[in-house]
Amino acid sequence: MDYEFLRDITGVVKVRMSMGHEVIGHWFNEEVKENLALLDEVEDAARTLKGSERSWQRAGHEYTLWMDGEEVMVRANQLEFAGDEMEEGMNYYDEESLSLCGVEDFLQVVAAYRNFVQQK
């Protein structure tokens, strides 16, 4: 999972993620917006979930972050899974609306984002 942090002309941090993980970048850009307290909450949840069967989620304005002890999912709130309308054996995946990654990879991006934001 590749990522890049940039500052726009006004100094706002923007995240760009590799193909298949774009929604994670959108989550940082739309929900985090340099709010390090939110990142603290996510990191605390990850520590609590490690080695357990529980899951945790944080719904935002545009995106919801869900995680368990192994995986992180970020999805657009407008995305609805209409299982009855899907053909048997078909999975719904929209790279503009849903991204999955491992918890450790996600926490590496969180740490790198935090470091970049603090370099002002």
UniProtKB/Swiss-Prot annotation:
InterPro entries: UPF0231. Belongs to the UPF0231 family. NCBIfam families: PRK05248.1-1 (NF003574), PRK05248.1-3 (NF003576). This is UPF0231 protein YacL. It comes from Escherichia coli O6:K15:H31 (strain 536 / UPEC).
